[in-house]
Amino acid sequence: MLILASSSISRANLLKTAKIDFRQVSFDYDENLNKNISPFLYVQKIVLEKERQFLSTLGKDFQNQNLLFADSIVCIDEKILTKAKDKKEAYEMLALQNGKYASILSAFLLVKPEKRVFSLSKTTLYFKNFDENALRDYVENDLYKGKAGCIMCEGFHQNFITQQVGNLSTALGLDIQTLKAYL
């Protein structure tokens, strides 16, 4: 059995859909790291920091188990977009994507008793212009909350994607194809 060390509903749904036997363990992580580095390094450091925090607090309870740590960020060029703190920040992030593109970087660390596997994947989504009413509804109803870069591939953004380069599961927060290869 896999232990998903994350409160992400999206990641849990991806594992269920892939028929991977898992148990979800929610943990409140401090994700405040210096964002003045490349987005690729940033998401990797976040995953390693999640592992460190989880093991320092709950490590005794999960010895010799298969643990999965994951994180996703959105970047536009080299600008890192994490989770919006409020509606103003959500509107700013969405304005950067409107009629343009955004890349989702998803990293995971699979810790097994006999090995460690680290994976970094990228999916780029290209968008047509957002409908202003749909955008306002999305933000004003707080649907952006908890979403890296305010991106909701299975919701708001779905209607505006013109091209996708990479796996949908990566855009949703976990590269399932790669994970399955190492389970």
Curated annotation (Swiss-Prot):
- What is the name of the protein in this document? Nucleoside triphosphate pyrophosphatase
Q: Which UniProt keywords apply?
A: Cytoplasm, Hydrolase, Nucleotide metabolism
High-level lineage: Bacteria, Pseudomonadati, Campylobacterota, Epsilonproteobacteria, Campylobacterales
Function of the protein: Nucleoside triphosphate pyrophosphatase. May have a dual role in cell division arrest and in preventing the incorporation of modified nucleotides into cellular nucleic acids.
Task: Look up the coiled coil feature and give its residue ranges.
Answer: none
Catalytic activity line of the entry:
a ribonucleoside 5'-triphosphate + H2O = a ribonucleoside 5'-phosphate + diphosphate + H(+); a 2'-deoxyribonucleoside 5'-triphosphate + H2O = a 2'-deoxyribonucleoside 5'-phosphate + diphosphate + H(+)
Q: Which cofactor does it need?
A: a divalent metal cation
Keyword Hydrolase: yes or no? yes
Pfam families for this protein: Maf
Q: Which GO terms describe its biological process?
A: nucleotide metabolic process
The protein's matches in InterPro entries, at most eight in alphabetical order, are given as:
ITPase-like_fam (IPR029001), Maf-like (IPR003697)
Source domain of life is Bacteria
Q: Name one GO molecular function term.
A: nucleoside triphosphate diphosphatase activity
**Where is it located?**
Cytoplasm
Q: Which residues does the Swiss-Prot or TrEMBL record annotate as the active site? A: D71
Q: What is its EC number?
A: 3.6.1.9
Which PANTHER family did the record assign? BIFUNCTIONAL DTTP/UTP PYROPHOSPHATASE/METHYLTRANSFERASE PROTEIN-RELATED, BIFUNCTIONAL DTTP_UTP PYROPHOSPHATASE_METHYLTRANSFERASE PROTEIN-RELATED
Q: Which GO terms describe its cellular component?
A: cytoplasm
Q: Which family does it belong to?
A: Belongs to the Maf family.
On whether Hydrolase is a keyword of this UniProt record, the answer is: yes
Its main localization is: cytoplasm
Q: Which CDD domains match?
A: Maf
